[in-house]
């Protein structure tokens, strides 16, 4: 999502240990370059803050869908945290994930479930405080049996 709340949440993760934050423009190449260092890392692909008001969510959502299709398989990711309806739809569609078996609400207003063995969480782009994405990443790690520092 390009909503200011989501951009604030992405900024909260920048520079924190265990997180790799990529801007959309160079994400596929940068992720491929860093792939050997990414296992156990939360990878966030963020929309650029500048220009966010001039390009529709749909444009960024489609681009994220294409990026997910390019890099998701090689990363063998265990979870997806998707922000914004257009983003969620585009990424899930690009990955061929059609059904999510919902089972939890890790934060108020955030749906979580499983799609073909992948933990999927979706939230509105404008929802949550600055620590929301971090809290969801910690939740995902616990569900996947990965020990992560919760701070």
List where the protein language model places each region:
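Active-site catalytic microenvironments in core metabolic enzymes, especially phosphate/sugar-handling
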Residues: 1-151
